[in-house]
Amino acid sequence: MSDKTFLVEIGTEELPPKALRSLAESFAANVTAELDNAGLTHGKIEWFAAPRRLALKVANLAASQADREVEKRGPAISQAFDAEGKPSKAAEGWARGCGITVDQAERLTTDKGEWLLYRAHVKGESAEALLPNMIATSLAKLPIPKLMRWGASDVHFVRPVHTVTLLLGDTVIPATILGIQSDRVIRGHRFMGEPEFTIDNADQYPQILLERGKVIADYELRKAKIKADAEEAARKIGGNADLSESLLEEVTSLVEWPVVLTAKFEEKFLAVPAEALVYTMKGDQKYFPVYANDGKLLPNFIFVANIESKDPIQIISGNEKVVRPRLADAEFFFNTDRKKRLEDHLPRLQTVLFQQQLGTLRDKTDRIAELSGWIAREIGADVNHATRAGLLSKCDLMTNMVFEFTDTQGVMGMHYARHDGEAEDVAVALNEQYQPRFAGDDLPSNPVACAVAIADKMDTLAGIFGIGQHPKGDKDPFALRRAALGVLRIIVEKNLSLDLQTLTEEAVRLYGDKLTNAKVVDEVIDFMLGRFRAWYQDEGYTVDTIQAVLARRPTRPADFDARMKAVSHFRTLEAASALAAANKRVSNILAKSDETLNERVNAATLKEPEEIALALQVVVLRDKLEPFFAEGRYQEALVELAELREVIDAFFEKVMVNVEDKDLRINRLSMLEKLRELFLRVADISLLQ
């Protein structure tokens, strides 16, 4: 039998749009693994996903597994039979497992002895017999957080299932999947094309669905069409569509036959901050906003219909009517909120709990204000502006706009602060206090904003760790991992002179007696250093490079970064491998010694030329490198230390360290300790592999 194309399509009710891609990709990965594990050879595997279907098409699928020879060695002959030649229980159990009797077994003779042997020719199973279970298993492994049950059956899936199509070439594979008997029936678009039709051959998919069912099953093709049509629609009205990836993905997952249309809203709504209008259009309505070439929002939006209407004007008008009340709400909230100053909301923060043991949002803003001022002083920012921004940082949470449109927190604080006449860096800080919100997000743009962003995150870290509620496993309800990484990114990428030790101590101090964890400072610092590990691994640094720096526990993030770059560069040097090995040897020698070493190397005790040369080099470099260490010039320091390779190699080749002469032994150990201390000023080089 020749290879054939295999098709599986699961026809469902509307699938969750934000999960559609991951469901389809996981389905493809699961089926691929099942085929490979079963030894069924195949060609390209394509996945298809639309709101009411998941499908896979496998090219050149083998008709069956290859036949194979099976050999199973049993017990040694000496243990397979007793003195009378009767099979032992071990032999009988082995034979039973192979489906034979002991006397049917062959014997395997080698130079090491003789064993019972089972040998068989196993015929490969057909793909038709294997596929139903493979598909069922693959569907059961999909990442579905919440399953549904429908009708009177006990079947569970992400959404109710109506059709299951299993075709191998032109043959239907009989099976019951998710409670549905397989067939060659496929359902088309709800309102266009044929509602239901049969497919004769797997190779006809997805073209037959496009032509007869009016469904673009190819997810990437559908997405590309929406993107291209939306860009063209925006160009026609002299603008650029805001086609954010997340919304583009969601809209792609909502439609089977995308028709891009352009609509408008009243220009008076442009007086409302663009962020609020965009939040309404994108978040609530799944519309694409349109911007002019100068970056200003236009009174237009682009949306995607799931039907090709004979009267698109009606659809456009309907969407304009839907969005208008939402924009009118935003306008009302904006005008109402501006009747009060931001600071007028401070008393209401006392009514909102931050955390049961840690007090209210007003308590938190007071701490943020003081900590922001302290940080500003450390980094040379405007202390008064930072303190003011910290005090106002959560006031916009009490406004009507943010209550209704929660994602506008921060940005509305900025607009209201500008309206109140606050300093510009204060206003900007209110918006940027939450940055970076995710990996790769922008950092705060000015020093005051940096101070407030760090203060907000450090207050949360200190408080939650201070009551013993640090993240456990995958659970991180207060987003402490994101907060820690955000603080580190700001300090490193803005090159701020902040020390995690004093920063954490100050954040903890501001809580007074609210915290119950006596180890809170150390735990917060260790947690943040752990975030460094994840960050630098993502940046491509090797694990041992990170461990070498972490071993020194540097608490200044900018200093940590400088050490990482220095060690990474050191690894490119020709002497790096030998020096890492030498450091490891020195470390092991010192670890095995329990003797009290000298504070200084006694020059008079030195005997061998090689130890004299090494001692001299250590003294010279110690003095020479002190300014390097003080200024954080770690890369230059390690380059200088790399020059020690030859004298270190010569020392270990010619000099015995653990000699019987105690004074000589201790002097040599002391010299090695001084040598190791030089490298440890940067990192623990002995940990490099």
From Swiss-Prot:
GO terms for molecular function: arginine-tRNA ligase activity; ATP binding; glycine-tRNA ligase activity. It is found in: Cytoplasm. It catalyses: tRNA(Gly) + glycine + ATP = glycyl-tRNA(Gly) + AMP + diphosphate. SUPFAM superfamilies: HD-domain/PDEase-like (SSF109604). GO terms for biological process: arginyl-tRNA aminoacylation; glycyl-tRNA aminoacylation. Keywords: Aminoacyl-tRNA synthetase, ATP-binding, Cytoplasm, Ligase, Nucleotide-binding, Protein biosynthesis. Its EC number is 6.1.1.14. One of its GO terms (cellular component) is cytosol. PANTHER family: GLYCINE--TRNA LIGASE, CHLOROPLASTIC_MITOCHONDRIAL 2, GLYCYL-TRNA SYNTHETASE. Tetramer of two alpha and two beta subunits. Belongs to the class-II aminoacyl-tRNA synthetase family. This is Glycine--tRNA ligase beta subunit.
